[in-house]
Amino acid sequence: MTNIRKTHPLLKIVNNAFIDLPAPSNISSWWNFGSLLGICLILQILTGLFLAMHYTADTTTAFSSVTHICRDVNYGWIIRYMHANGASMFFICLFMHVGRGLYYGSYTYMETWNIGVILLFATMATAFMGYVLPWGQMSFWGATVITNLLSAIPYIGTNLVEWIWGGFSVDKATLTRFFAFHFIFPFIIAALAMVHLLFLHETGSNNPTGISSDADKIPFHPYYTIKDILGALLLILALMILVLFSPDLLGDPDNYTPANPLNTPPHIKPEWYFLFAYAILRSIPNKLGGVLALVLSILILVLMPLLHTSKQRSMMFRPISQCLFWILVADLLTLTWIGGQPVEHPYIIIGQLASIMYFLLILVLMPMASTIENNLLKW
């Protein structure tokens, strides 16, 4: 008799995705981040569910309800900090996952890549709305500043912002709808992640060489199941070290002050994982230009398959492209640092140079390097 996992309609799907899936024999730890993102998402949904049981989405009680969770609810503090720092781990894994895709040319799987970009946007939107919920100073002013960016859209901008706010400023209506959206979005992300996986399994995984691995496949289980479990343990270890030793390391002290529309904090800045985009936004002295640059800084990922001029898929055997890739990483770290600094000399000019460098590297230098590398070899 055939094994039930191969015949049962539901188990068959699980079997083909996680057990008998043929996988390349040489995929490195950079291929662990997909499963880690899945674990992060499940963790966020579970901790978020328990937080939602005690949270109230009302301007008068939101801040107090978060305080209540931390002080009075059994293990509420650990649930709250696991959720807040879980978001940081989520974004670390996301950036690593995208970086892996860029380095090894995984973006040539167009459908998988484009759904990945949509997933990135959806995750960023979810994180932004979640940051508003505790209704601290940075929550309120962050929401005000970021939603206000939409007013830069010609003609419909102002109406659009007021429609999103549900009034003439960020208020009760805004908080309530953000809570509703923050609750539903992770499930949309989970659904999209399944489509992401569906498209990936149409082609199979890429591997570090960028060459077809059809001639040398191994079963996903036990080889990569055990590898994913190791990755998961390391992820949870890192998260728990953060949660139990320095839970407020990545947060903003201003968010421990209740939201006050009459008092603007001296430095409005988002969570660390948005700082690179925030720096790009601020580096352009025009509102609409800044908003366009902000959107394009992420949307540029969609162009990656079109900008691929190399005859090799992966950067593994392309030293010039490797150098430029790591310069891009350093540039993004520079932008992240600048995004957290006040708008004054020398930070303004550093931010502008780093922003120019970001777009220049992706749009001009990397495609040029690929062309040079093609000509260095006999094909």
Swiss-Prot record:
InterPro entries: Cyt_b/b6_C (IPR005798), Cyt_b/b6_C_sf (IPR036150), Cyt_b/b6_N (IPR005797), Cytb/b6-like_sf (IPR027387), Cytochrome_b (IPR030689), Cytochrome_b_C_euk/bac (IPR048260), Cytochrome_b_N_euk/bac (IPR048259), Di-haem_cyt_TM (IPR016174). It comes from the Eukaryota. Heme b b566 binds at residues 97, 196. The chain crosses the membrane at residues 33-53, 77-98, 113-133, 178-198, 226-246, 288-308, 320-340, 347-367. Binds 2 heme b groups non-covalently. CDD domains: cytochrome_b_C, Cytochrome_b_N. Heme b b562 binds at residues 83, 182. One of its GO terms (molecular function) is ubiquinol-cytochrome-c reductase activity. It is found in: Mitochondrion inner membrane. It is a multi-pass membrane protein. Its cofactor is heme b. One of its GO terms (cellular component) is mitochondrial inner membrane. The keyword Metal-binding applies. SUPFAM superfamilies: a domain/subunit of cytochrome bc1 complex (Ubiquinol-cytochrome c reductase) (SSF81648), Transmembrane di-heme cytochromes (SSF81342). PROSITE patterns: CYTB_CTER, CYTB_NTER. A ubiquinone binds at residue 201. Pfam families: Cytochrom_B_C (PF00032), Cytochrome_B (PF00033). Keywords: Electron transport, Heme, Iron, Membrane, Metal-binding, Mitochondrion, Mitochondrion inner membrane, Respiratory chain, Transmembrane, Transmembrane helix, Transport, Ubiquinone. GO terms for biological process: mitochondrial electron transport, ubiquinol to cytochrome c. Heme 1 (or BL or b562) is low-potential and absorbs at about 562 nm, and heme 2 (or BH or b566) is high-potential and absorbs at about 566 nm. Belongs to the cytochrome b family. Component of the ubiquinol-cytochrome c reductase complex (complex III or cytochrome b-c1 complex) that is part of the mitochondrial respiratory chain. The b-c1 complex mediates electron transfer from ubiquinol to cytochrome c. Contributes to the generation of a proton gradient across the mitochondrial membrane that is then used for ATP synthesis. The cytochrome bc1 complex contains 11 subunits: 3 respiratory subunits (MT-CYB, CYC1 and UQCRFS1), 2 core proteins (UQCRC1 and UQCRC2) and 6 low-molecular weight proteins (UQCRH/QCR6, UQCRB/QCR7, UQCRQ/QCR8, UQCR10/QCR9, UQCR11/QCR10 and a cleavage product of UQCRFS1). This cytochrome bc1 complex then forms a dimer. This is Cytochrome b. The gene is MT-CYB.
